[in-house]
Amino acid sequence: MADRNDTGLLAPAERDLRLDLMRGIGQWMVFLDHIPYDIVSWLTLRNYGFSDAAEFFVFISGYTAGFVYGPAIANRQFLAAAKRLLKRAWQLYIAHIFLFLFFIAQISRAARRFDNPMYGNEYNIFLFLEHPDVMIGQALMLKFKPVDLDVLPLYIVLVLALPAILWGLFKRPAWTLLGSAIFYVLARIFDWNLPSFPSGNWYFNPFAWQLLFVFGAWCGITKAAKITTLIRSRAVMILALAWIAFSFLIVMTWHVPFLDALVPKWMIHIIYPIDKSDLDMFRLLHFLALAVVFVRYVPSSWPMLHSRVLRPLILIGQNSLPIFCLGVFLSFAAHWFLVQIEGDVVAQILVSVAGMMLMVAVAWVLNRFKALPDHFALPKAPAPERAV
């Protein structure tokens, strides 16, 4: 989310390729999860635990923002950092609106060209096609969102709040974290959320998901130094592995009917519903458990991070926003193709692999494009000489 290319404002920092790796893996998972009935999507995290790629994206976005903009706040450049963050929020908003328009066009063309209204109903654009004059205004206010376009509005709201969050984490970190946790609890108790149109609320409740984002920003500012001992303790590792195993067993009951009967009724009442919209605590704990294991066994100096094997995923992670937008189009294109040909398992695998490889190719092109020298950049004015 933060722009690592900002110079002059931000202190130079070595890039943690683990973040790019996890963003790249997350982009592949989102692409596969957005293809209905795709057998390859069984490889994604949501089928084996409470959390999924959404938790990773929100945490990493917060961590990166804290890591990148924290030094600016510390150097009393709050206004400059706030200006940069507001500009970033505007960029995300423009990206969302363009993605919305092209996505609507893609789905509506498929629905009309192949006389299949199922696409309009599946992706929640049927009302837009009937009343475009009303719905475009609601879309501009982020109240109307087709299926699969919920995450960027969440980021926009979080980035808008980021200057205040970073200031609080720098001045009063304990109180800011406590306030975030209290806000999360109150939002869940009183059902606080932003309204959607024509009915309902936001799929990703920003009042709940801010907790993970704020925690990520705090970890980024402090480089997680204050919890390093806790993360590396044997007791925390055992608890993390136990929670991951428990989550796996519960999720398996969703897929294997006879396992469901083995879960006590009292436990069912405690566990469910495991709500994604309001960031259920079980999902949050599962993500934190995975993060503990990942940080423990994948250090930032891991040689594989510089290998050719992981390079494609890291490239995707380094171009997260454009690749996410591309993935939205590719997931619908894959769904459309499989519906039209009534694709079998082989077709599902081929389409999924082709989409993932295309994401890698586009990420490679974007990286090459960014590496090109800017021959039209204005030369910097020489610094004024000091009087002796």
Question: Model-predicted segments: where are they?
Answer:
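Alpha-helical transmembrane segments and their immediate juxtamembrane cytosolic regions
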Residues: 1-388
